[in-house]
């Protein structure tokens, strides 16, 4: 299981690196003199459906949360669901020279949640799962403005494409699994790993120094990971004492499409 996640992450990282390199190559003919700018903005992401699964379903010490069996829906044991709509705020410091822009970008996703269901029981029975998350990412990005001579004109709109690669730190809080008579808690965790994005959008000049950007963005933040640690099972009617658990890590992928709206302010040139 873990090997599959790592392989996918490596492939995604190579794609991102090649995309950034291509952007830099396309922009290499830009003039040497340029302008420094600041960016501030916000956005919304809609990650794709995902599932938390054991890193090693055969682990016994610590114990795998799900194990290697097949659930009531015929799929491997897991918690399937989604992260809903994820808000993001971003700040960037960039350098623009001709058709090329290079930017150091930080994005913070202050609060979002996983909501899903396990498949230990038959479909239709109560087995909900929930957890709260946050993340912060830092990337180096390259953009190419496409409003070059010979291309179709879009009035005041200036199209652009870009890509970036960097690191992300994602935190997940305690996970709560609610069954018909019991509640299981799973320890949270943090993970630092590779992040990358690809984007395309349009820019509108609002003044001599201010530009509005509206963009589509695909962002891959890698894996969300619960750590090894103590969990427990509680019988809500008090019929039994809580049962402590020593649990192995689980993980799920966090990636999806979104939109960004931001302002660029040119501070000066050199």
Where are these regions (language model features)?
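Substrate-binding/catalytic groove segments of enzymes
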Residues: 171-173, 204-213, 222-228, 270
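Short loop/turn motifs that connect adjacent beta-strands in outer-membrane beta-barrel proteins
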Residues: 30-35, 147-158, 206-209, 268-270
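Outer-membrane beta-barrel "beta-signal"
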Residues: 35-37, 253-270
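Extracellular/periplasm-exposed beta-strand and loop segments of Gram-negative cell-envelope proteins
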Residues: 47-84, 107-138, 167-193, 222-258
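Transmembrane beta-barrel architecture of outer-membrane proteins
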Residues: 35, 84-90, 101, 135-139, ...
């Amino acid at each position: 299981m873990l090997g599959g996640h790592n392989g996918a992450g490596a492939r995604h990282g190579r794609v991102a690196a090649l995309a950034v390199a291509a952007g830099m190559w396309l922009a290499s003919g830009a003039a040497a003199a340029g302008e420094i700018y600041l960016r501030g903005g916000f956005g919304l992401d809609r990650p794709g459906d995902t599932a938390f699964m054991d890193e090693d379903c055969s682990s016994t010490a610590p114990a795998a949360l799900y194990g290697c069996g097949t659930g009531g829906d015929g799929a491997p044991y897991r918690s399937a669901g989604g992260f809903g709509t994820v808000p993001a705020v971003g700040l960037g410091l960039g350098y623009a020279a001709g058709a090329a822009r290079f930017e150091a970008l930080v994005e913070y996703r202050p609060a979002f949640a996983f909501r899903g269901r396990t498949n230990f029981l038959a479909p239709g029975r109560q087995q909900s799962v929930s957890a709260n998350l946050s993340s912060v990412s830092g990337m180096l990005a390259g953009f190419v403005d496409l409003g070059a001579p010979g291309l179709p004109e879009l009035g005041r709109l200036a199209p652009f494409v870009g890509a970036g690669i960097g690191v992300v730190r994602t935190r997940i809080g305690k996970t709560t699994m609610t069954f018909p008579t019991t509640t299981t808690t799973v320890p949270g965790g943090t993970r630092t790993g590779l992040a990358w994005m690809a984007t395309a959008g349009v820019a509108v000049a609002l003044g001599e120094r201010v530009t509005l950007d509206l963009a589509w963005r695909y962002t891959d933040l890698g894996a969300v990971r619960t750590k090894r640690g103590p969990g427990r099972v509680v019988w809500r009617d008090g019929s039994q004492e809580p049962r402590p658990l020593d649990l192995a890590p689980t993980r799920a992928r966090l990636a999806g499409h979104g939109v960004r709206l931001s302002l660029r302010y040119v501070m000066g040139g050199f």
